[in-house]
């Protein structure tokens, strides 16, 4: 019974994502195709085979936040930086998704993990997320801890040779997916929101 409830929540999350990204027809595909056949914009995973995500980082309040905080509810995780316009647009779309889900009484925890912890301290993350949604959780930590976690999610990122005069930094390029984590702390799916590349 609980599995059916979780599956319904996942379906509604997918529909919300589709509404925001303008790919409504995927909802119809989702209702008629098995997860293994659904290949457009989403990758699924067998939850029984998926390992639990493990990490320990620091949130925007300067407190320890580890992988146990992902258990007990669904979570959406996104990796990025506070100075990227692209990441800002993505998080605002995630905020729109959360609003839709709240109307369906589905509570989803949103976790934003910086890929540039040397710049994005707890204080920087707090000020940044207050402008988007202060219910979002922002995580930073040691460079090696961020790299290990990014590796668990198969996040690809590197610092390019393009210098951004607005941020006075070299651009950090990275893969752009939103990850859905189960209430057991396991990877379920990842989504591409299809935003234009703006930096």
Curated annotation (Swiss-Prot):
The family this protein is said to belong to: Belongs to the SCO1/2 family.
One Pfam family cited in the UniProt record for this chain: SCO1-SenC
Species of provenance: Rickettsia conorii (strain ATCC VR-613 / Malish 7)
InterPro entries: SCO1/SenC, Thioredoxin-like_sf
Entry protein name: SCO2-like protein RC0042
